C-alpha cells in the first residue's frame, strides 16, 4: 500500500481543495493508496478531521500564523520540521500560492520523497507581484516536482512554467463529484427550506471561504441590488474565513442582517444546494471551482465572473459576467436568466462531461502507483 502525504498551503477548512481531495479519498481504493493530511497552519473543520480518521488517514497541523497574503516563514519552517520527523515516498502539494508549490516541492524532494506532485487549483491576480513570484519560483518548479496536476488548462498556465505547458508535461484532473450524492430532489428542497424557514423566499446561495479571492464584498453588493427588486430574497452564505467579520459588518451596515443566513461550516451541502434558487460566485479568480460543478449537479444556474475558467460542465447553466459590470447589472442579469427557468436533474450531463468521481479517482490512483 502506498501512503501519500497531502500538503496544503493554507489552513484546512471547507474549501475547494479540501472538497476535491476528499471526493478522491472517499472513492479511491484505500487498500492500494492511503492519505495523510498536513497544513503548516491550522484546521478549523472538525468534521473533516473525523472523516479523514474514519477513512484511515491522519491530520497534522502545526498551528502556524496565517493571513490572506500567506505566511512564507511559517510555511517553510513548519513543513521542513514536519518532514524531518515523518517520511513519505509520495507528497502531493495543493495551494493557491505559487510560492507554496515551488518551495513546498523543494522541501519535499530534500526530505527524500521520490514522487512530488504540485497541483494547481486556481488562477490569481495578474499583477507585478504575481509576475515577480512566478519568475523567482520557476527554477524550483522546473527542478523539484516530478509531476504537475491542474484542474484546468487555465489553472496549469497560471502556476506552471511555460516549458511545462509547452511540452504538455502536466495532467488535467477534473474536479469530479459523487453524482450519487449530489442531484436535484424536490423533496429534499422542500424539507430543507422548511427547516431554514425560507419556504417562500428567493434564495441566492454561495459557498466559499471568506477570503479576498472569493470577492464576498461584491457579492453583498449584488445581493443588495437583488433584494431591492425582489423583496422576498435571502442570501445564504456557507463557509468561514479571515474576512468573515469584515463581511458581517458590511451586511449590518447595509441593513441586511435579517436577509442573510450565515451558516458557517456545513456538511449537508446537497441539502443546502437543493434549497437554493441560484448560485452566485463572483470570484476574482478560480481554476475550475468544485462548488460550481456541485451546484450544477443539483440543477442550479451558476452565475460567476469571467475570472473563472469557462469549463463548467453544463454550459446552459453557466453564466459568466465581467467584474467591471456594476452590481446592479449583475442583479438584473441574474433575475432575468432565472425567470422562467425550470430546474431539472443534470446527473447524466455531469457524467457525460467526465466529472464522475469514480473515473477521476481511478485515474488519480494510477498516477500515484505508476
Model-predicted segments: where are they?
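A charged, aromatic-enriched C-terminal amphipathic alpha-helix characteristic of glycosyltransferases
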Residues: 341-370
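A conserved mid-protein helix/loop that constitutes part of the nucleotide-sugar donor-binding site
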Residues: 15-23, 202, 206-225, 242-248
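A short, active-site helix/loop in glycosyltransferases that binds the activated sugar's phosphate group
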Residues: 144-184
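Nucleotide-activated donor-binding/catalytic signature segment of Leloir-type glycosyltransferases, i.e.
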Residues: 248-264
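Aromatic "clamp/platform" in nucleotide-sugar-dependent glycosyltransferases that forms part
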Residues: 265, 284
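A short helix/loop element that forms part of the nucleotide-sugar donor recognition site in Leloir-type
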Residues: 183-198
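N-terminal strand-loop element at the rim of the active site
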Residues: 6-77, 169, 242, 367
Amino acid at each position: 500500500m502506498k501512503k501519500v502525504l497531502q500538503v496544503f498551503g493554507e489552513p484546512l477548512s471547507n474549501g475547494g481543495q479540501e472538497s476535491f481531495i476528499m471526493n478522491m479519498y472517499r472513492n479511491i481504493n484505500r487498500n492500494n493508496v492511503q492519505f495523510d493530511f498536513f497544513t503548516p497552519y491550522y484546521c478549523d473543520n472538525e468534521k473533516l478531521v473525523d472523516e479523514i480518521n474514519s477513512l484511515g488517514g491522519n491530520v497534522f497541523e502545526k498551528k502556524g500564523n496565517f493571513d490572506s497574503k500567506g505566511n512564507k516563514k511559517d510555511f517553510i519552517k513548519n513543513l521542513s520540521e514536519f518532514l524531518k520527523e515523518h517520511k513519505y515516498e509520495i507528497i502531493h502539494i495543493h495551494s493557491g500560492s505559487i510560492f507554496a508549490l515551488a518551495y513546498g516541492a523543494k522541501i519535499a524532494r530534500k526530505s527524500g520523497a521520490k514522487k512530488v506532485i504540485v497541483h494547481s487549483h486556481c488562477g490569481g491576480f495578474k499583477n507585478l507581484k504575481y509576475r515577480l513570484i512566478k519568475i523567482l519560483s520557476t527554477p524550483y518548479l522546473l527542478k523539484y516536482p516530478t509531476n504537475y496536476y491542474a484542474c484546468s488548462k487555465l489553472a496549469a498556465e497560471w502556476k506552471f512554467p511555460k516549458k511545462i505547458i509547452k511540452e504538455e508535461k502536466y495532467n488535467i484532473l477534473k474536479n469530479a463529484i459523487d453524482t450519487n450524492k449530489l442531484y436535484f430532489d424536490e423533496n429534499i428542497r422542500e424539507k430543507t427550506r422548511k427547516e431554514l424557514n425560507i419556504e417562500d423566499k428567493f434564495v441566492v446561495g454561495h459557498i466559499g471561504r471568506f477570503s479576498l479571492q472569493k470577492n464576498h464584498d461584491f457579492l453583498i453588493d449584488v445581493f443588495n441590488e437583488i433584494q431591492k427588486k425582489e423583496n422576498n430574497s435571502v442570501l445564504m452564505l456557507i463557509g468561514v474565513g479571515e474576512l468573515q467579520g469584515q463581511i458581517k459588518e458590511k451586511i449590518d451596515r447595509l441593513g441586511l442582517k435579517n436577509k442573510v443566513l450565515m451558516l458557517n461550516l456545513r456538511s449537508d451541502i446537497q441539502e443546502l444546494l437543493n434549497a437554493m434558487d441560484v448560485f452566485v460566485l463572483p470570484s476574482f479568480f478560480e481554476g475550475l471551482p468544485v462548488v460550481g460543478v456541485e451546484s450544477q449537479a443539483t440543477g442550479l444556474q451558476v452565475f460567476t465572473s469571467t475570472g473563472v475558467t469557462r469549463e463548467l460542465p453544463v454550459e446552459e447553466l453557466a453564466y459568466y459576467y465581467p467584474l467591471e459590470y456594476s452590481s446592479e447589472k449583475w442583479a438584473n442579469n441574474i433575475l432575468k436568466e432565472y425567470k422562467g427557468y425550470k430546474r431539472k436533474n443534470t446527473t447524466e450531463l455531469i457524467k457525460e462531461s467526465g466529472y464522475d468521481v469514480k473515473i477521476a479517482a481511478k485515474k488519480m490512483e494510477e498516477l500515484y502507483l505508476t
